[in-house]
């Protein structure tokens, strides 16, 4: 397997790679504006990773509630609140705190989520939908996207905004730390269904896995305790998909600080996901037939940078453009 150059306006250099030892990205684009000074977003919080709060509902009761019907769950919750009268003042105080936080400094009204969504849709309809009748007319007939994109659920890294994808251009899957698990028909059927639909039915030509800076999921992966203990119901088990990336980074970057190791793992975890894509038979078939290409990317929203690298599988040598 060789690292292929990306046929785009990016600066390209040839490189060789293997799934066991992925190389550094071979394409780089700096998306910065020297005329503006962009500060680091104030919402980035440096808090403990996967720190589970003390549960109001004990783990055994939580598991039992997960198996209940909607009506049973409501009844159980009402019973819990009636038995734990001390929760009332706590809940009221928390509501007051949230309300105070949502008040802006100029004393305007609290944030209204319904009004926010209504205003957002009105803007979309008047500024985009009604101004592009040809586009949305075609989309009403079906979709034929060129890209399938795996991106993180992080609210700061929407791929449609970052890469300016228009409606109908990208079939997007978002999850914690933009992970792609290996083929598993029972454990990760949701991801498998998305890949199968994109490759076999939508006939996408590119699958792109995009990591990003300051990823909490990757920080959590790098912080997993060595004894295997867990404090969450789902998150830690999910990010363990990237354990090969963690092991590689800790082995090759032992002299680096934790923050730099996390940055390296953000990119290495993308390579692990690209490798996992090869465990899907229809992905391998697409690569052999050259109807499908795999690409990895990393979006640095702190510095305004984007790296892109490609993988090509076959007998032909890689090319540089």
UniProtKB/Swiss-Prot annotation:
Please give the InterPro entries that the UniProt record associates with this protein: Beta_CA_cladeB, Carbonic_anhydrase, Carbonic_anhydrase_CS, Carbonic_anhydrase_sf
Record GO biological process: carbon utilization
Keyword annotations: Chloroplast, Lyase, Plastid, Transit peptide, Zinc
Question: Transit peptide boundaries, per UniProt?
Answer: 1-100
- GO molecular function ontology, one term from the record: zinc ion binding
Question: Reaction(s) catalyzed by this protein?
Answer: hydrogencarbonate + H(+) = CO2 + H2O
What do the Gene Ontology cellular component annotations say? chloroplast stroma
State the compartments where it is located.
Plastid, Chloroplast stroma
Q: What class of enzyme is it?
A: lyase
EC numbers listed for it are 4.2.1.1
Which PROSITE patterns does this one have? PROK_CO2_ANHYDRASE_1, PROK_CO2_ANHYDRASE_2
Q: Which Pfam families match?
A: Pro_CA
Under the subunit heading, UniProt states: Homohexamer.
What PANTHER family does its record include?
A: BETA CARBONIC ANHYDRASE 2, CHLOROPLASTIC, CARBONIC ANHYDRASE
State its role. Reversible hydration of carbon dioxide.
UniProt similarity note? Belongs to the beta-class carbonic anhydrase family.
Question: What is the protein name given in its UniProt record?
Answer: Carbonic anhydrase, chloroplastic
Q: What is the lineage of its organism?
A: Eukaryota, Viridiplantae, Streptophyta, Embryophyta, Tracheophyta
């Amino acid at each position: 397997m060789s690292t292929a150059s990306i046929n785009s306006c990016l600066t390209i250099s040839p490189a060789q790679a293997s799934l066991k030892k992925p190389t550094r990205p071979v394409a780089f684009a700096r998306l910065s504006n020297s005329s503006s000074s962009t500060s680091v977003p104030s919402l980035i919080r440096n808090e403990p990773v996967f720190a589970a709060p003390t549960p109001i509902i004990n783990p055994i009761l939580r598991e039992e509630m997960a198996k209940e019907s909607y009506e049973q769950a409501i009844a159980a919750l009402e019973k819990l609140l009636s038995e734990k009268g001390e929760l009332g003042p706590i809940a009221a105080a928390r509501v007051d705190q949230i309300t105070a936080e949502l008040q802006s400094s100029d004393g305007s009204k609290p944030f209204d989520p319904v009004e926010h969504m209504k205003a957002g849709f009105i803007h979309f309809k008047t500024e985009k939908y009604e101004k592009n009748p040809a586009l949305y007319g075609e989309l009403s007939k079906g979709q034929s996207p060129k890209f399938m994109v795996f991106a993180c659920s992080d609210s700061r890294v929407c791929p449609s905004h970052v890469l300016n994808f228009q409606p109908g251009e990208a079939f997007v899957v978002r999850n914690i730390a933009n992970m792609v698990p290996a083929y598993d028909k029972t454990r990760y059927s949701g991801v498998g269904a998305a890949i199968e639909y994109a490759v076999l039915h939508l006939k996408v030509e590119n699958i792109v896995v995009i990591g990003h800076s300051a990823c909490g999921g990757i920080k959590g992966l790098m912080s997993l305790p060595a004894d295997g203990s867990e404090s969450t119901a789902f998150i830690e088990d999910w990010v363990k998909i990237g354990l090969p990336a963690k092991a590689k980074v800790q082995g090759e970057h032992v002299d680096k600080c934790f923050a730099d190791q996390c940055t390296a793992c953000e990119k290495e975890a993308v390579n692990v996901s690209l490798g996992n894509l090869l465990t899907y038979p229809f992905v391998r078939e697409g690569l052999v037939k050259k109807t499908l290409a795999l690409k990895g990317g990393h979006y640095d929203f702190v510095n305004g940078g984007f790296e892109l690298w490609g993988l090509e599988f076959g007998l032909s040598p890689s090319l540089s453009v």
